[in-house]
């Protein structure tokens, strides 16, 4: 896949991130099945197993007692979130050296729009991917997998085809053979619940999901996301750049070293998240009129609450109070594994000023 006027979107994902970093911190467990887990939670859940543990059937979100049944010699290591964050920061610093259009989607993965950067690498996207892989490996001792395509959905799916430390490229000619035969559970973003609902109406493979005769019943399950998803899977959507996506939302989240259920402790962590997203909002000269908060529990279930503001703003106090009020409504004294905030429906500050000027 080489640059020929078409977008080049790369998805970069650090392989078994938490487990690999913990393995680096504990070299005595090299070549042992290990997993990062929350031993102090009520449930005891696996957060991230290394690849050796996965070969025994150990998976993320699996109860620790069940993981131990599958792999009796499994070593459970505590979460070291501050250290993970340090490694993550170094990873994104490396990525930004190669491309300035980067969309960070979590602590260990991102998308880059390499459409314009690829010229520096002889229009060879595989060469660019390998250079990033090798620098991350040499400097951080982490392996990353790279998926490359012309939209984010297909690029993310490509990453999963050749893990760990793989490079997968999917162009229009390969979609039918590599993507359409896959199970619908392989589609990013739809989740296990939606997958089960699609199974219940006899839609099992991607080719069945995108078939025109299944449109009506699939739309009932997937709602407004159906058409965009199908267009992505068919390769029909005009690709928006990473710069375009910056104007959709700004978000930040934190996974706790131990599950928390103290309101004030969680609230203090929330304060830092709010400060982070508002500072980024101001840095990009943007404003928002929609905020959301998401909470992930030890069993990996997630609760999301959203609120529309009466007007566009970048005012810290306004956003702070809105998010804190939202948190008070959604939090019910449960143990919390992760908390995140998001500013949505973003617009350039200048455009809001122009609209106000029209009514002066």
From Swiss-Prot:
Binding of Mg(2+), residues: 13, 108
Recorded GO terms, molecular function? damaged DNA binding; DNA-directed DNA polymerase activity; magnesium ion binding
**Note accompanying the cofactor annotation:** Binds 2 magnesium ions per subunit.
Which GO BP terms apply?
Answer: DNA-templated DNA replication; error-prone translesion synthesis; SOS response
- Catalytic function, reaction form: DNA(n) + a 2'-deoxyribonucleoside 5'-triphosphate = DNA(n+1) + diphosphate
Q: What is its EC number?
A: 2.7.7.7
Q: Which cofactor does it need?
A: Mg(2+)
Q: Does DNA repair count among this protein's keywords?
A: yes
- Major location, coarse class? cytoplasm
Residue ranges occupied by any UmuC domain in the UniProt entry: 9-191
Q: Where is this site: Substrate discrimination?
A: 18
Q: Record's InterPro entries?
A: DNA/RNA_pol_sf, DNA_pol_Y-fam_lit_finger_sf, DNA_pol_Y-fam_little_finger, DNA_polymerase-Y, DNApol_IV, Rev_trsase/Diguanyl_cyclase, UmuC
Q: Where in the cell is it found?
A: Cytoplasm
Q: What quaternary structure, including any partners, is listed in this protein's UniProt entry? A: Monomer.
Similarity remark: Belongs to the DNA polymerase type-Y family.
Free-text function comment from the UniProt entry: Poorly processive, error-prone DNA polymerase involved in untargeted mutagenesis. Copies undamaged DNA at stalled replication forks, which arise in vivo from mismatched or misaligned primer ends. These misaligned primers can be extended by PolIV. Exhibits no 3'-5' exonuclease (proofreading) activity. May be involved in translesional synthesis, in conjunction with the beta clamp from PolIII.
* Protein name, entry field: DNA polymerase IV
Its taxonomic path starts at: Bacteria, Bacillati, Mycoplasmatota, Mycoplasmoidales, Mycoplasmoidaceae
Q: Which gene name does the record give?
A: dinB
């Amino acid at each position: 896949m080489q640059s020929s006027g078409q977008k080049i979107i790369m998805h970069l994902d650090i392989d078994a991130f938490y487990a690999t970093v913990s393995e680096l911190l504990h070299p005595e467990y090299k070549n042992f099945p290990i997993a990062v887990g929350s031993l102090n939670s009520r449930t005891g859940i696996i957060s991230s197993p290394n690849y050796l543990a996965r070969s025994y059937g150990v998976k993320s979100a699996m109860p620790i007692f069940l993981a131990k049944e599958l792999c009796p010699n499994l070593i459970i290591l505590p979460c070291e979130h501050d250290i993970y964050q340090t490694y993550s920061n170094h990873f994104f610093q490396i990525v930004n050296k190669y491309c300035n259009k980067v969309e960070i989607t979590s602590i260990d993965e991102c998308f880059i729009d390499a459409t314009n950067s690829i010229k520096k690498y002889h229009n060879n996207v595989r060469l660019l991917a390998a250079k990033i892989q090798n620098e991350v490996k040499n400097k951080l001792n982490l392996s990353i997998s790279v998926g490359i395509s012309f939209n984010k959905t297909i690029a993310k799916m490509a990453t999963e085809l050749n893990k760990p430390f793989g490079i997968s490229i999917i162009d229009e000619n390969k979609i039918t053979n590599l993507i359409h035969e896959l199970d619908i559970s392989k589609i990013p973003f739809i989740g296990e619940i939606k997958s089960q609902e699609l199974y219940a109406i006899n839609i099992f493979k991607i080719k069945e999901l995108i078939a025109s005769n299944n449109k009506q019943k699939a739309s009932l399950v997937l709602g407004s996301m159906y058409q965009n998803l199908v267009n992505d899977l068919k390769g029909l959507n005009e690709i928006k750049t990473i710069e375009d996506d910056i104007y959709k939302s700004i978000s930040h989240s934190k996974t706790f070293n131990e599950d928390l259920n103290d309101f004030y402790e969680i609230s203090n962590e929330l304060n830092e998240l709010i400060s982070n997203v508002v500072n980024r909002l101001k840095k990009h000269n943007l404003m928002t009129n929609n905020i959301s908060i998401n909470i992930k529990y030890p069993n990996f279930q997630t609760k999301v609450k959203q609120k529309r503001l009466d007007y566009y703003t970048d005012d810290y106090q306004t956003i702070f109070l809105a998010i804190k009020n939202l948190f008070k409504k959604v939090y019910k004294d449960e143990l919390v594994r992760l908390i995140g905030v998001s500013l949505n429906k973003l617009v350039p500050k200048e455009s809001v000023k122009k609209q106000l000027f029209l009514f002066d």
